[in-house]
């Protein structure tokens, strides 16, 4: 009976596949996509947008009220900025935009988010409406775990692209906005925007086009100071600073002069000024984080010791403010054609020339900082040594060329990387700077100092002095100007350094400048300052690791001794050769291993587990420095000599 039942049970199962085949559903097909948001047109938008931002200091929220003029009913698409100039990436803060409501004549107007382009909101405008009133909040990070903190009970750092919706279909320069900001009682502000009126705590600014608004951040604070960096000049330049505490704004006279020198040296380097006024916006704070370039201003976040104890903050003084200022010429006035976008959403940015936009700016930032006196010649050389050593040791240069790293802002958007040493990340800054040092020293050598990269900067960025209308360029324009300075195979020079891996010419500029990279067992003051700022101890060029004071491993060099021993970031060093870990103990162990030739034993803690690893490393402590090359002119000193 059991056997008969089993056979009967199997019969319909055996017959099932044939029946099922006859009734199979049709093959899957892709769903129809919604119509794409139309490309922007270079025509003016009728009317003026009124935009008002009110900070909620207790909750780190920016409240936005916007009035958008409309004509006639029908479909309208509103866009929240996605591609942010200066970040080179689609990192618009759409996830932090909340509470959107739209009304017309007091009645609610429904909206629908585009299911593909989530930065777009579709609205059916009522036929009778003359304007739409929009209300929403930008929920700024409350802690650094969520992102850069831009608001405290004493500081508010406002970037307008986080607080505006704009109509699709228009170039940003065709949309006019009248911005306003509700200034907390007792606060002051700095911005490139020009004040039109003030009443009841609300500051209303003169109308500007949307592209200018997005390019004009506002820094406000309870503790505020403003300094004239170009006294008596026809083109005003100021430094506007907000701070955690009033004492953080005490600047020494010689330090103020060094910042004034940045303005003077930059104008000489570029033989032009492409703004009608400029404001360095500075947040002197250990609580907030900021930094971005703009055409008539710059955002600069610095530690609370920046003015009061410059020796503690050597690291950020090596390039930061001159770098962001240089972007007014390199990146804002003259902009790579594929990075210029008519709006902030529909036309994506591409960064194929970031080695000019950021790489040459990085170079000039370091050079101008030295020329101005923000850093000493020794600090400049130490920074250069650190850069050269870091890139020389970087394993990722063996598989990935410099040109490909210009895609990183889109690929990664500065998210943390497990193995940055192997993957690489935005190396067009530092390796780009070394490439431009290479070009500078080559021009100086071949012309017997009759020309230099400053000559290039004056020709390339110095056109149309006084204009701040963007002028775009392509690779051939860069090559053409270099050839006008000194005829050479500049296309080959650049493409060799951009497209090969590894780039064996990495240190050519340093050596042609009359110096060479060497390693000793002494760490430079600049390196110590950088480590102190990050609260780590660097053994990058010896064991191939960086550790915090408590032994937590922050980074491991791909393929280095620590890597070969099985270490990675995230583990902790508990003991060194049987003694509790501290940086001095590890340093001593590295030194002793040179003589004893005995592997260095580390007790490693990872989660709930412990293990001991032995690292057979016997080459001692290694820290980078520059050493003079006899018989080669000291072109490096010529490069950082102040311009007259």
Set out the residue ranges of the language-model regions.
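Sec/Tat signal peptide C-region and signal peptidase I cleavage site
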Residues: 16-22
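C-terminal recognition in membrane/secretory proteostasis and scaffolding
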Residues: 365-366, 375-644
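Ligand-binding face of N-terminal immunoglobulin V-set domains in extracellular IgSF glycoproteins
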Residues: 65, 75-80
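N-terminal, polar/Ser/Thr-rich
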Residues: 23-57
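Bacterial N-terminal signal peptides
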Residues: 6-16
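Positively charged n-region of N-terminal signal peptides that target proteins for export
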Residues: 1-4
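Juxtacatalytic substrate-recognition/specificity segment
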Residues: 66, 228-354, 360, 364
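Non-catalytic architectural context of zinc metalloproteases
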Residues: 23, 41-44, 56, 65-67, ...
């Amino acid at each position: 009976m059991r056997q008969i039942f089993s056979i009967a049970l199997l019969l319909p199962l055996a017959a099932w596949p044939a029946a099922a085949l006859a009734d199979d559903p049709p093959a899957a097909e892709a769903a129809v996509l919604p119509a794409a948001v139309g490309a922007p047109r270079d025509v003016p938008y009728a009317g003026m947008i009124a935009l008002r931002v009110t900070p909620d200091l207790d909750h780190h929220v920016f409240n936005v009220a916007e009035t958008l003029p409309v004509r006639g009913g029908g479909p309208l698409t509103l866009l929240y900025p996605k591609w942010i100039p200066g970040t080179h990436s689609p990192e618009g803060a759409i996830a932090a935009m909340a509470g959107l409501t739209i009304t017309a004549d007091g009645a609610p107007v429904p909206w629908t988010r585009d299911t593909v382009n989530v930065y777009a909101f579709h609205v059916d405008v009522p036929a009778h409406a003359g304007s739409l009133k929009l209300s929403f909040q930008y929920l700024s990070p409350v802690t650094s775990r969520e992102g850069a903190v831009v608001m405290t009970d004493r500081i508010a750092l406002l970037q307008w692209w986080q607080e505006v919706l704009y109509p699709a279909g228009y170039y940003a320069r065709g949309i006019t906005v009248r911005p306003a900001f509700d200034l907390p009682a007792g606060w002051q502000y700095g911005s490139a925007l020009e004040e039109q009126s003030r009443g009841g705590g609300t500051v209303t600014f003169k109308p500007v086009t949307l592209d200018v608004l997005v390019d004009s951040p506002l820094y406000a604070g309870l503790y505020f100071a403003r300094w004239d960096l170009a006294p008596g000049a026809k083109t005003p330049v100021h430094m506007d600073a907000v701070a955690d505490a009033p004492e953080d704004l005490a600047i020494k006279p010689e330090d103020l002069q060094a910042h004034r020198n940045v303005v003077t040296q930059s104008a000489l380097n570029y033989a032009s000024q492409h703004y009608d006024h400029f404001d360095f916006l500075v947040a002197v704070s250990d609580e907030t984080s900021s930094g971005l370039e703009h055409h008539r201003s710059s955002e600069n976040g610095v530690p609370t010791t920046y003015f009061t104890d410059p020796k503690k903050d050597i690291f950020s003084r090596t390039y930061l403010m001159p770098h962001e200022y240089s972007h007014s010429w390199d990146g804002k006035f003259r902009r790579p054609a594929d990075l210029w976008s008519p709006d902030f959403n529909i036309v994506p940015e591409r960064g194929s020339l970031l080695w000019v936009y950021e790489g040459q700016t990085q170079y000039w930032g370091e050079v101008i900082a030295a020329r101005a006196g923000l850093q000493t010649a020794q600090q400049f050389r130490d920074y250069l040594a650190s850069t050269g050593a870091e890139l020389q040791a970087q394993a990722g240069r063996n598989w990935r060329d410099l040109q490909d790293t210009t895609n990183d802002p889109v690929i990664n958007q500065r998210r943390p990387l497990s193995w940055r040493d192997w993957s690489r990340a935005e190396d067009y800054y530092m390796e780009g700077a070394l490439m431009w040092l290479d070009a500078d020293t080559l021009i100086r050598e071949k012309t017997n100092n009759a020309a230099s990269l400053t000559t290039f900067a004056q020709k390339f960025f110095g056109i149309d002095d006084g204009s701040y209308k963007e002028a775009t360029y392509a690779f051939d324009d860069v090559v053409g100007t270099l050839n006008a300075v000194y005829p050479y195979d500049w296309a080959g020079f650049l493409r060799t350094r951009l497209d090969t891996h590894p780039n064996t010419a990495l240190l050519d500029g340093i050596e042609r400048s009359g110096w060479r990279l060497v390693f000793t067992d002494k760490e430079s003051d600049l390196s110590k300052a950088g480590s102190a700022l990050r609260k780590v101890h660097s053994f990058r060029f010896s064991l191939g690791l960086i550790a915090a004071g408590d032994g937590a491993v922050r980074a491991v060099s791909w393929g280095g001794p620590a890597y070969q021993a099985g270490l990675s970031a995230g583990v902790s060093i508990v003991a060194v050769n049987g003694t509790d870990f501290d940086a001095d103990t590890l340093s001593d162990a590295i030194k002793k291993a040179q003589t004893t030739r005995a592997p260095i034993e580390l007790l490693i803690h990872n989660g709930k587990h412990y293990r001991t690893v032995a690292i057979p490393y016997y080459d001692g402590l290694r820290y980078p420095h520059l050493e003079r090359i006899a018989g080669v002119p000291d072109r490096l000193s010529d490069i950082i000599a102040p311009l007259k």
